[in-house]
Amino acid sequence: MSFQTNYIHLADEILSGKTSISYEQALEILNSDENWWEIYAAALYLKNQVSRNNIRLNVLLSAKQGLCAENCGYCSQSKESTADIDKFGLLPQNVILKQAIVAHQNGASVFCIAMSGTKPSKREIEQLCQVIPEIKKSLPLEICLTAGFLDREQLHQLKQAGIDRINHNLNTPEENYPNIATTHSFKDRCDTLERIHNEDIDVCSGFICGMGESDEGLITLAFRLKELDPYSIPVNFLLAVEGTPLGKYNYLTPIKCLKIMAMLRFVFPFKELRLSAGREVHFENFESLVTLLVDSTFLGNYLTEGGRNQHTDIEFLEKLQLNHTKKELI
């Protein structure tokens, strides 16, 4: 399919504040054929005009694993998963602090603490509210927390403790949500994001691509998330885990994944777009191209799935001449 939009011109119009990408133009990107590389070049131009060759590094700690009452079909920690994973309660505070120190030493500027479960207990919130100030006092790290459907009081406590950001992904389009999880709804996720906003905490929210969503659904989801004004957008590509309902699910191709990221770059030109889980698997020889499009990425492992050695990640970024500093986006 050839396309009608001049995407370099569109990028300039976006940069000048004159316009933003339309639904139709976003769909055109996903449907592009032989001229996809022209769109990629325009998306890269857009990224470089905003944040140059800077990339921020995130390290993820699985601080509580398994034992989850939700039934998310992609997740090895859900109650319906038979995946062989370690299961444990919230790690002791000294262990979390030690892992934060290691993250800082490895060049991370963001330390992500992830907890399984519907939401933390009162005791777990108290523990988090003790360790967060300790990390902030001793290390120049931003802290992002993933902890399920946090209520207003829990968010207020975390805000007082100094949390920088809360992650709560929308994951998949609303019409696809019942195919992925039934113990909660898409609305439950949107409501959680609203509560985070209301406590004046930065929102980190994104997607898991490759779970049966349509192109139209993915674009609608992106525009819905844009309305919620996230600080950062982690983009995951399904890591099909044996023992989960989506364990044999895989219809993504490297070029499709690259088009998705180019589209999201146009939808979120001034936000922190993060390349997350699945990059090592789905992009194959295109991983260099997609890494140049984003503002941040993860070092090392994910939750229950392995990533790359962190030093290998750093070497890869340096070969691309990306500056992994701790500077904020322009």
Swiss-Prot record:
Disulfide bonds: none annotated. Its cofactor is [4Fe-4S] cluster; [2Fe-2S] cluster. One of its GO terms (biological process) is biotin biosynthetic process. Pfam families: BATS, Radical_SAM. It catalyses: (4R,5S)-dethiobiotin + (sulfur carrier)-SH + 2 reduced [2Fe-2S]-[ferredoxin] + 2 S-adenosyl-L-methionine = (sulfur carrier)-H + biotin + 2 5'-deoxyadenosine + 2 L-methionine + 2 oxidized [2Fe-2S]-[ferredoxin]. [2Fe-2S] cluster binds at C112, C144, C204, R274. [4Fe-4S] cluster binds at C68, C72, C75. Binds 1 [4Fe-4S] cluster. The cluster is coordinated with 3 cysteines and an exchangeable S-adenosyl-L-methionine. Binds 1 [2Fe-2S] cluster. The cluster is coordinated with 3 cysteines and 1 arginine. Keywords: 2Fe-2S, 4Fe-4S, Biotin biosynthesis, Iron, Iron-sulfur, Metal-binding, S-adenosyl-L-methionine, Transferase. It comes from the Bacteria. Gene3D superfamilies: Aldolase class I (3.20.20.70). Pathway: Cofactor biosynthesis; biotin biosynthesis; biotin from 7,8-diaminononanoate: step 2/2. Residues 53-276 form the Radical SAM core domain. Catalyzes the conversion of dethiobiotin (DTB) to biotin by the insertion of a sulfur atom into dethiobiotin via a radical-based mechanism. HAMAP family: BioB. Belongs to the radical SAM superfamily. Biotin synthase family. This is Biotin synthase.
